[in-house]
Swiss-Prot record:
Annotated NCBIfam families: PRK00278.1-3 (NF001371), PRK00278.2-4 (NF001377)
Pfam families: IGPS
Known catalytic reactions: 1-(2-carboxyphenylamino)-1-deoxy-D-ribulose 5-phosphate + H(+) = (1S,2R)-1-C-(indol-3-yl)glycerol 3-phosphate + CO2 + H2O
Keywords from the named record: Amino-acid biosynthesis, Aromatic amino acid biosynthesis, Decarboxylase, Lyase, Tryptophan biosynthesis
InterPro entries documented for this protein: Aldolase_TIM, Indole-3-glycerol_P_synth, Indole-3-glycerol_P_synth_dom, Indole-3-GlycerolPSynthase_CS, RibuloseP-bd_barrel
Protein name in the entry: Indole-3-glycerol phosphate synthase
GO BP term (any one): L-tryptophan biosynthetic process
Domain of life (superkingdom): Bacteria
Biochemical pathway: Amino-acid biosynthesis; L-tryptophan biosynthesis; L-tryptophan from chorismate: step 4/5
Family as reported in the entry's similarity comment: Belongs to the TrpC family.
GO molecular function, one term: indole-3-glycerol-phosphate synthase activity
Its EC number(s): 4.1.1.48
Length: 255
């Protein structure tokens, strides 16, 4: 894996965006608001369960997975939302996976991609996403705010991903309601769960917070549970022998 992981991804995204056309807006898929759900269900650490066939750091993870069956298992075992990788080149995802899953589940769905343009946002919404991902490290603050406001104007919720204190401060400044702390450094691709613990001391009351990456066991989940509303988990679920059991293991009771 290149040390310049994020710039490599963004260069590819620029090429993809140049080929996209702005789609006509389709009706927004109806489900509950993730923010409201996380605010009103704080007795448990909520799980955002990811459908991910591969990644740059892990290579192929589970290429033969039945994506709809996997998503339904997540939903049946209490996942708060399903994250669907739509990046083709680096994660072997596809926008069609989001479309398929969104028609088969009732809970919110996250379009997991490196979004840099309004055309990607509309495409994700039309494919069934109710939440999109915006990564602070991928965008200048003014552009991040533009895309955030555009997405919310279309009825979408936005997971704003951060990795360090300056990025967390940006997320707070733009008024993000759902903030992710990625324990993976998108430049070196190394993970450290302490990233979540350190940044949690700077949290505010209004947003909800999601810890992302480097969470594989109930013990990992328990470390962040006192400070976070939820966790985003992909690899641990995609490689689990018993997916239902793994989801339950990660749902830490917060009392």
């Amino acid at each position: 894996m290149s040390k310049a992981f994020l710039p490599t991804i963004l260069e590819q995204k620029e090429k993809e965006v140049a080929q996209l056309v702005m789609e006509d807006l389709q009706p927004l898929r109806q489900t509950y608001r993730l923010y409201d759900f996380l605010k009103s269900n704080q007795n448990k650490l909520q799980i955002i369960s990811e459908v991910k066939k591969a990644s740059p750091s892990m290579g192929d993870i589970n290429l033969d997975v039945d994506i709809v069956a996997q998503a339904k298992t997540y939903e049946e075992n209490g996942a708060a939302m399903i994250s669907v990788l739509t990046d083709e080149v680096f994660f072997k995802g596809d926008i069609s996976y989001l479309k398929e899953i969104s028609t088969q589940v009732a809970i919110p769905t996250l379009a997991k991609d490196f979004i840099i343009d309004e055309k990607q946002i509309v495409r994700s919404r039309n494919a069934g996403a109710t939440v999109i991902l915006l990564i602070v490290a991928a965008l200048p603050e003014a552009r991040l705010k533009e895309l955030y406001d555009f997405a919310t104007s279309l009825g979408l919720e936005v997971l704003v991903e951060t990795h360090n204190l300056p990025e967390l401060e940006v997320a707070h400044r733009i008024g993000a309601e759902i903030i992710g702390v990625n324990n993976r450094n998108l430049v070196t691709f190394e993970t450290d769960i302490n990233t979540s613990l350190e940044l949690s001391t700077h949290f505010k009351d209004k947003p909800v917070y999601i810890s992302e990456s480097a969470i594989f066991t109930g013990q990992d989940a328990a470390l962040v549970a006192p400070y976070f509303n939820g966790i985003l988990v992909g690899t641990a679920l995609m490689t689990a022998d018993n997916v239902a059991k793994k989801v339950k293991e990660l749902q830490i009771d917060k009392g």
